[in-house]
Swiss-Prot record:
Function statement: Attaches a formyl group to the free amino group of methionyl-tRNA(fMet). The formyl group appears to play a dual role in the initiator identity of N-formylmethionyl-tRNA by promoting its recognition by IF2 and preventing the misappropriation of this tRNA by the elongation apparatus.
Family: Belongs to the Fmt family.
Keyword Protein biosynthesis: yes
Molecular-function annotations in GO: methionyl-tRNA formyltransferase activity
This protein's UniProt keywords: Protein biosynthesis, Transferase
GO cellular component: cytosol
Enzyme class, UniProt record, top EC level: transferase
The protein, known as: Methionyl-tRNA formyltransferase
Binding site for (6S)-5,6,7,8-tetrahydrofolate: S110, L111, L112, P113
Lineage: Bacteria, Bacillati, Bacillota, Bacilli, Bacillales
Catalysed reactions, as listed in the record: L-methionyl-tRNA(fMet) + (6R)-10-formyltetrahydrofolate = N-formyl-L-methionyl-tRNA(fMet) + (6S)-5,6,7,8-tetrahydrofolate + H(+)
Assigned EC number: 2.1.2.9
InterPro entries named among the record's database cross-references: Fmt, Formyl_trans_C, Formyl_trans_C_sf, Formyl_transf_N, Formyl_transf_N_sf, Formyl_transferase-like_C_sf, GART_AS, Met-tRNA-FMT_C
Length: 317
């Protein structure tokens, strides 16, 4: 029986680990990120993969930097024949890549070579894609650039956000791994090199990408809202303070209205003008210092009127 070390950190990785366990593979160790403070109270919280591993009595390593020699030694002491990674969050050093008999394979949430990097699910929606998927590939020292072993496509629904698409891809990735690992161990695969000319990237989301630019089209703004939900969440400014926008709908308009202006008050919330003949209906928002609420509740409690402008800081008023 091949000895497998699994490396992963967030919720996306958990079904992948569960698949290895339920399929009866000998998972001799799990490597994940250190516990981190979470929430307003900054409570030290273990990664989801650690929680799952401990349920099954699997030893857990939590290196701050897996590339350090002493951390590499700890992983190799587990004598892995195969390393499987999924959203681990660190690039593996050459010693780890070279040691296992069957190499290191990674479950990546995109159709490589598109969307290499740490936020492929976000970018799939931000870019308005109609489909994405999961690729399993051999790991190399470059980011998500190894030869591809298997792929599966996943449709992106018009109503998907990062949370719902994440769950679809996590399940699809686990199922793909179930079919792929036996072929890797038996050597019955024909890995395909990636086309470097077709490579695109999905780096981690930056703060400036969260702010809604009302001069963009309604479609772009709609994709931005769902492409940042449930994390880190798009925002605009209202009355000089941040207003998070969790959910929205596109509204067709007969004429193009002023970008950022409140042009209509519907039952579900305010409609805001954009950079084309579409309005953006804000159906789920979170004013500064308050809890998330429906657009309807926001209208009921806020003094918002037709003609007001969103996206202005105090100094711009």
């Amino acid at each position: 029986m091949a000895r497998i070390v699994f490396m992963g950190t967030p919720d996306f990785s958990v079904p992948v680990l569960q698949t290895l366990i339920t399929e009866g593979y000998e998972v001799v160790g799990v490597v994940t990120q250190p516990d981190r403070p979470k929430g307003r109270k900054r409570v030290l919280t273990p990664p989801p993969v650690k929680v799952e591993a401990l349920k099954h009595g699997i030893p857990v390593l939590q290196p701050e930097k897996v590339r350090l020699d002493e951390e590499i030694d700890k992983v190799l002491a587990l004598k892995p024949d195969l390393i499987v990674t999924a959203a681990f969050g660190q690039i593996l050093p050459k010693r780890l890549l070279d040691e296992p008999q069957f190499g290191c394979i990674n479950v990546h949430a995109s159709l490589l070579p598109e969307l290499r990097g740490g936020a492929p699910i976000h970018y799939a929606i931000l870019q308005g894609k109609k489909k994405t998927g999961v690729t399993i590939m051999y790991m190399v020292e470059r980011l998500d650039a190894g030869d591809m072993i298997s792929k599966v496509e996943v449709e992106i629904d018009e109503l998907d956000n990062v949370g719902t698409l994440h769950d679809k891809l996590s399940v699809a990735g686990a199922a793909l791994l179930k079919d792929t690992v036996p072929n890797v161990l038996s050597g019955s695969i024909s890995p395909i090199p990636q086309n470097e000319d077709a490579a695109t990237y999905a780096p981690n989301i930056k703060r400036e990408q969260e702010r809604l630019d009302w001069t963009k089209t309604g479609e772009e703004l709609y994709n931005q809202v769902r492409g940042l939900n449930p994390w880190p969440v798009a925002y605009t400014e209202w009355n000089g303070a941040h207003l998070k926008v969790w959910e929205a709908k596109k509204v067709p308009l007969e004429v193009q209205e002023e970008a950022g202006k409140v042009i209509e008050l519907q039952k579900e919330g305010p409609v805001i003008g954009t950079g084309n003949k579409q309005g953006l209906l804000l159906t789920g928002v979170q004013p500064a210092g308050k809890k998330k609420m429906s657009g309807e509740d926001f209208l009921r409690g806020a003094n918002i009127e037709i003609g007001q402008k969103l996206g202005l800081m105090n100094e711009e008023k």
